[in-house]
Amino acid sequence: MIDITNESGSPSNEEGLVGLATFALDRLRIHPSSELSIILVDEETMEAYHEKFMGLPGPTDVLSFPMDEMRAPGDDEDPPSGLLGDIVLCPTVTARQAAENGRTPDGEAEYLLIHGLLHLLGHDHAEPGEKRVMFRLNDEIIAAWDDHREQTGQR
């Protein structure tokens, strides 16, 4: 189950984010009964979370708060089910950095949603090798999502 809450006061493509999260969880072979929360917040709230949980000043674009320790299964394993956790996005920060990254605001939000989801599944980018794996997987999921929308006329 995917729950999305917009506390940001900014318009957002919530339906699109839920669709992408559903698609990504299926692609990553996470059981469809797993629970994920997506929370959209304003800059002030994101800044408070960033400082409280990361010890860093200023707002950021995305934070992930894992619940159950889950990983994508191997080919011969059953999909895991449980509480994935929360992904917190800040639409105003996302919109500002979208142009820097050559994306639309919706495209940036989608990219960051997958980034946050991968963190919930144990991926990280502290080391160069981890970063390559995580960012490659992020790009692959977004490309597959774009293809899916193209094929189903959702673009």
From Swiss-Prot:
Residues 64-84 are annotated as: Disordered. Its EC number is 3.1.-.-. It comes from the Bacteria. Binds 1 zinc ion. GO terms for cellular component: cytoplasm. Its cofactor is Zn(2+). It is an enzyme of class 3 (hydrolase). Pfam families: YbeY. Keywords: Cytoplasm, Endonuclease, Hydrolase, Metal-binding, Nuclease, Ribosome biogenesis, rRNA processing, Zinc. Disulfide bonds: none annotated. Its main location: cytoplasm. It is found in: Cytoplasm. Zn(2+) binds at residues 115, 119, 125. GO terms for molecular function: metalloendopeptidase activity; RNA endonuclease activity; zinc ion binding. GO terms for biological process: rRNA processing. Single strand-specific metallo-endoribonuclease involved in late-stage 70S ribosome quality control and in maturation of the 3' terminus of the 16S rRNA. HAMAP family: Endoribonucl_YbeY. Belongs to the endoribonuclease YbeY family. This is Endoribonuclease YbeY. The lineage of its organism: Bacteria, Bacillati, Actinomycetota, Actinomycetes, Propionibacteriales. The gene is ybeY.
